[in-house]
Amino acid sequence: MSAGQRPAPKFPLRLDQVKPAGRSGAAPLLRPQRPLHQAATERGRGTTPAGLGLDSHLVRERMLARLQAEGVRDARVLAAMRAVPRHSFVDTALANQAYEDTSLPIGLGQTISKPSVVARMIELMLALQPAGARPRLLEIGSGCGYQAAVLAQLARQVVSIERLRPLYDKARENLAPLNFGNLRLVYGDGRIGHAPNAPYDGIIAAAGGEDIPQPWIDQLGPGGRLVAPMLDARSGGQVLVVIDRHADGNLVRSLHEAVRFVPLKSGTD
């Protein structure tokens, strides 16, 4: 350890060991593997829901314009979200709200995250990846499968874990028409990650607890980045925590903005 360096805190990581950090820079465009919006239209769950307008792609473009206005700059993320039909991942009764910047219920007390939160977290996770990279990614909390579909546009391989069996089944149903060959859904305990496919270049979590589980740290590869919500005991709310593993194995942690996610739980139901 060089002079002036402070020793890295031990895990489980807590927020009193983390200092704030600013937003990361953008990266150039990485085009999707296939025109997913066409596949979803041709092979998905029917026609555009009533009320979305003559073309849901126009509604999607307005969503992307809002994301850009709010500071999302990574063209890879915007292209991936352009390709994924969010209305196909929510209940028909809520489809008219699919492209609003709001979270929506998906059952069992769970929600699909706001588009701005999805974009921000993925942008943070990919900030260390060079242009043209196809990283290996781990998602904790598949939910309805929407974020997994966005990640599959960007990655060489995505492993997505869901602990609630009905949601796991729903995600499989939602994703099946899109026919991703690089996406694996796993029914299991997200707190333990998925060691068989580790190490990962990026790990992203859609649930937050009081600490960052040690298995996630262990499964993060050199040059990788983990982005997850975590409880801030001082405020009682959640904030985004980013953990980078440098090529030499050292970990660097930073604290970002306040968020609101469902609690991170162990086991399966």
Curated annotation (Swiss-Prot):
<dbReference type="InterPro" id="IPR029063">
    <property type="entry name" value="SAM-dependent_MTases_sf"/>
</dbReference>
<dbReference type="Pfam" id="PF01135">
    <property type="entry name" value="PCMT"/>
</dbReference>
<dbReference type="GO" id="GO:0032259">
    <property type="term" value="P:methylation"/>
</dbReference>
<dbReference type="GO" id="GO:0004719">
    <property type="term" value="F:protein-L-isoaspartate (D-aspartate) O-methyltransferase activity"/>
</dbReference>
<comment type="function">
    <text>Catalyzes the methyl esterification of L-isoaspartyl residues in peptides and proteins that result from spontaneous decomposition of normal L-aspartyl and L-asparaginyl residues. It plays a role in the repair and/or degradation of damaged proteins.</text>
</comment>
<keyword id="KW-0808">Transferase</keyword>
<feature type="active site">
    <location>
        <position position="113"/>
    </location>
</feature>
<comment type="similarity">
    <text>Belongs to the methyltransferase superfamily. L-isoaspartyl/D-aspartyl protein methyltransferase family.</text>
</comment>
<dbReference type="GO" id="GO:0030091">
    <property type="term" value="P:protein repair"/>
</dbReference>
<protein>
    <recommendedName>
        <fullName>Protein-L-isoaspartate O-methyltransferase</fullName>
        <ecNumber>2.1.1.77</ecNumber>
    </recommendedName>
</protein>
<dbReference type="GO" id="GO:0036211">
    <property type="term" value="P:protein modification process"/>
</dbReference>
<keyword id="KW-0489">Methyltransferase</keyword>
<dbReference type="InterPro" id="IPR000682">
    <property type="entry name" value="PCMT"/>
</dbReference>
<feature type="region of interest" description="Disordered">
    <location>
        <begin position="1"/>
        <end position="53"/>
    </location>
</feature>
<keyword id="KW-0949">S-adenosyl-L-methionine</keyword>
<dbReference type="GO" id="GO:0005737">
    <property type="term" value="C:cytoplasm"/>
</dbReference>
<keyword id="KW-0963">Cytoplasm</keyword>
